[in-house]
Every structure is written in structure tokens, then in C-alpha cells.
Amino acid sequence: MTQEEALKILKNGHNVYLTGAAGSGKTYLLNKYIQYLKVKRVNVGITAATGIAATHMEGITIHSWAGIGILRTASDKEIQAIAGVKRIAKRLQKTQTLIIDEVSMLDADRLDLIEKVARIARESWKPFGGLQVVLCGDFFQLPPVAKANEPLPRLMYKSAAWQNLNLKVCYLHEQHRQGDQEILRILNAIRSASFDEAVVDRLYQCRTNELSLNPLSRFVKLYTHNPDVDLENERELARIPGGKYRYHMQMSGVLKIAESLKDGCLAPESLILKKGAAVMFVKNNFEKGYVNGTLGTVSGFNETGFPVITLRNNKEIVAEPATWSVEDNSKILAQNKQIPLRLAWAITVHKSQGMTLDAAQVDLSKCFERGMGYVALSRVRSLSGLRVLGFNDMALKVDEETLAFDQELKILSEAARHEVVSMPERRIDENETLKTNYLEKTRVKHPSAYKRWTADEETRLVSGYRAGKSVSALSEMLGREAGGIRSRLKKLELIE
């Protein structure tokens, strides 16, 4: 499918899964659609599963947008509480289109949780409360990482929310990335499990590539395991002359929870920095201009001893302590404070997802998961910016289930192209006019139709129902449609 065909499907208001290989222009198309929506004055929620991906579209993480934070699952009571937060409810109610990028990093349970929050906040039993939902990503990227003692997360396409959205699949097949076409051919060969000895030989030749040593374009070293990353970063830090600045994590609250929180956040318990150190932010702060994954260099320390970080765009940010906390019913159970940085001469392949690097040194000799090689190699724009130290048998393999699902997506995309492209394009602003007219007509007879329920209305509804009033009588009494009355009674668990 071409970008133009996919854009037409998006403009028709369908729920869409947008996918394609590296360089197919997924993010470009999303930005183009976002601009279209803004021109049409359609309120759009711009989100991504990772902070890095969110910055590509000037959005925020879906976790923050939906108010779920670090939650993976939640009880009905907790979901009601999230949906009842005024800020979250208002955001969900005024949004018309929700975009989620980098969805391979979002597991099935979290998508289902977000869907339930949206449904309750918008007071609609339609999937996501009737939002147009646009999911974008590539399941050849690495899946969400499981925390210690937790089961492996289910992939997003196995969620109930995915099944209920009735998604149109838009599989982009054209290559739009500027630069080295050779690396795109290699990535496509790995992606389709059709690579041969010529591909392997070409990657071996990259072992001797000379990468730029200019500090402003410092190349990143990618490893598959954290101990290798830590060792490399400690080695590089030791090479820098000058004094050390040490920052210890401050933990408070329930010790067991604080310890678990320490393992969950990416900031080290003890952070040692020097001027000139390569660092990466490990928390999102959109107001200050950094996200989890933003790279920079320590250019100095301010009068209070906090590190000053120069980003790759030459912007300077003072890295002040950030807070990680666990709450229960607005009560803080544990809280950790630390400078939101870690050393970043080297990072893991998992952490590199969503980044585009000018140059990278990659060690794939210890790959333990299918798809790792594809993710690592797809971080760079060209083979000239790639040095491969080595790779094992696992490095160039892709997940067989993902490969089979990818073939299914291509078939669904072709079906969507034939089905939708022949249809006339509906103008979203015209659709909104139709919706407005419908509401106006409905509210002539039912003045409160589709309005948020108040506590007083709920009390009157319950009293009337328990007094034996019929649905039609309750409808007339409260100025709402019969369907809205039944929906509220179900929500209040008064009827099945």
C-alpha cells in the first residue's frame, strides 16, 4: 500500500493499524495525518509507547495520556478511579482521534486497560469509547520486556481491544528513507527470513568500519546484555580526567516497595559522573525538554552540584533530581529520588528502540532473542555508520510467529486497499457537522442525552429504578435516551 492510499483510509475515519519496514515512512505519514486533523479542527491525542517515539510527533507517552502510569492491569475500582480523574476524563472526552506509535512496545494487557479507561471516561460501550484509533508500529521490533517474577507480556495483537477495533491494516511497501539503500535491502532480507551468505559477508565487512570520533557525533555502542553495557561505561568514565560527582538514590516509605521501585526505574542507585561523560535521560519530562532515551554529554555542573547536560541539538538542561513513587488511593507508599541519568557510551539493544543513530558499534555475539539483530541494525542510516563486532546464530533470525502474522497483515492490507480506496473520501469536518446535527435533534426530546452523568442524576436513577419505574419512565424523568438509561443501570450493576 502506498502512503497516499493509507492516508485516504485514515481520512475515512477507520480504525487503522499502520505498519511497514524500516524506511517506509510510517512516522512521516502519521505526522501528515496529524496536520490534516489539525486543519480540520479535529482534536487528536498524539501518543507513543516510548518517550523517544513520542518526541518524533511532539506527543506524550500513552501511559501518561491515559493516566495509567506504570500499571499493567487494574481492578474495576482502580479503572473507575483513573477515568474519574478530572484531567484524564476531560482529555478523553474531548479527543476524537487517538494515535499510538511504537505499539510493539505496548503489551496486550496495557492496551486492554487503556481501552477500558477510555470507554468509562467517555461513557460509551463502543471500543475506546468511540474514538478513531490509529495504531502504528512494527512487530519485528522487540516485544515488551518482562519484569522479574512476571509472566511474559502478551503481544498487543492478542488483546481483546485489538480484536474489537475492527482495524483496517495499512502495510506501507515503498521505501522513502534518504540515504544508503544497501542497508534497507539487508534489513528487508533479514525481516523476510530470506537473507543469504552475501548478506552475512557484507555485515562481516562492517567490522573494520572507521566511525567518527568527533564528540558532537559520538557513536553509541550497542550490547545485548546489561553487564556488558555497565562494563563499557565504567571503562569509558575512567578514561576521563577530572573530579567525580556522585549521586545516591534517596529511598523512603515501605522498604520492600522502594526496593522494587529501584529495580523498576532505570536510574542507578549510585550515579557517578564527570565532565565529558556520555549520558542518557531515563525519565520523561516534556516541559524541560527531555524524555526517556534522550542522549547528551555532561558539559559541567551548576552551583548546587547538579549536572548540566548538552543535548545533541546543543540545548542545555540542568538535570535535577526526579521522583519515582508508588501510590495507593492517593497515598504515597514509597518514593525514590535520583538524578534521572545513566552513563550512555553504551546502551542495550532493547533501550535503543525508537532511536535513529548516525553511527553505532554493535555487538550481537550474545543475542538471546529473535529480532535483536534486526532492531540493532535498523538503528543506523547507512552501513558506513555501522561497525559490527560479531554476531551469533540467533542474531539474524526473526520470530516465526511474527513472520507468519506479518504475512497475514499483508493480505489484510491488500484487502483494505481494494475495499476502501474505491470509496469516496469522507470529509471529517462534514462528519462532525452530521454528529452535531444528530445531537441537536436528539436533545430536543432528551435534553441530557450524551452528557456526563452527575451524582444527583445517578441518585435519582437508582431511587426511581428501585421504586419500580420502567426504563421509558426513567428516560422521560431524566431527559435521556432509553439506551443511555440501560447503559447506566448496567454500569451500576443494577441489571445484567
Predicted regions located by residue number:
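Short alpha-helical "recognition helix" segments of helix-turn-helix
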Residues: 473-476
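Short, solvent-exposed alpha-helical "recognition" segments
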Residues: 439-441, 489-496
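Conserved ATP-binding/catalytic motifs of P-loop helicase motor domains
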Residues: 1-437
